[in-house]
């Protein structure tokens, strides 16, 4: 976990989310698991940057004989692949147990995103917050809408001068100021 100044640490069970979001299920089934993983990483990178979260996206080793590895995807997102034989669930549980004794718990929230009921009970027992994969998807979509709304261009006045876009009362006050008629 990095030392970013974030308001929360978000742990995401990657395959659980892929299996819960309709658009990722479709990608997985039509284009493959790698494409679905990449899309999830891109989506979470944007979401994490918007929310100011430090996000750890966790994937099981998926039967691959490998040791744990992690890669920094962006400033806000790192991707963790568990060791052979370790599940994302156990990786997340260990992270929650460590966080429970970490001084950062007084400064940051720890949120776990998974729809696994047993996992939910365990992480809440460690003091973490929980959200389902569906809730995460809804929050991601809401964040995307907020960003789009912010980026909408302001309606520009068709008038050549700024004063023409002002209401009549303000225009009158400006005219008086210009003519030194104000008290």
Which sequence ranges carry the predicted segments?
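Nuclease catalytic cores that cleave nucleic-acid phosphodiester bonds
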Residues: 2-9, 16-183
